[in-house]
Regions:
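Feature captures hydrophobic
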Residues: 1-185
Length: 185
């Protein structure tokens, strides 16, 4: 039988409400840049999607007032940010912490699905292909973002580790040795 999903931290409501004040679309540019870097560093992600490499995926953090739409492509991957979820091939919805935890291997996807903390709609085969591609790549979003920060990387990793400890949200891979109890500088 599947394990019980742990209690998942939710994004603070006041911060989520504040996100409603500005436009969502400009968030797409930095997210697209991060996604393109991930694809460049992990080109097998696109290949692993197989027949779903042209699918559009809605990633819907249910505790935030926006939806991310992933358009995978070997060189032109794009993430668009919308207030309302547009029509896509597959929609994966759940609290932001659960979605990040799936990427980092901190949560069991089956347990989240059967506990209804994670909802899959549309083409479930496409969603499964995306999940398998991400699992195989062993992505570390915290490390990828830190790498983008150039000379600030040494200072950023301890900050990411501290934020992870304080919030309980998986911001990097669970097995990342850089998340030792380093002091925040």
């Amino acid at each position: 039988m599947f394990g019980h999903a742990p209690e998942i931290p939710l994004f603070p409501r006041p911060l989520a409400a504040a996100m409603r004040l500005g436009p969502a679309e400009p968030l797409g540019l930095p997210l697209t840049l991060i996604a393109r870097r991930l694809i460049a560093r992990h080109p097998s992600l696109i290949g692993r999607l197989g027949e779903y490499a042209q699918a559009r995926f809605a990633i819907d953090p249910t505790d935030l007032p926006l939806t991310l739409v992933l358009h995978p492509h070997p060189t032109r991957t794009r993430i668009a940010v919308h207030r309302e979820a547009p029509a896509t091939d597959a929609r994966i919805a759940g609290p932001l912490a659960a979605l990040l935890g799936l990427v980092h291997g901190a949560y069991d996807g089956d347990a989240l699905f059967f506990s209804r903390d994670l909802v899959i709609e549309g083409d479930t085969s496409a969603a499964l292909a995306l999940r398998n591609a991400i699992d195989d790549a062993e992505l570390d979003l915290g490390a990828e973002i830190a790498a983008l920060s150039g000379p600030f990387r040494p200072a950023l990793m301890p900050l990411i580790a501290a934020a992870q400890r304080l919030t309980g949200v998986s911001l990097t891979r669970a097995d990342d040795p850089r998340l030792s109890e380093e002091p925040v500088t």
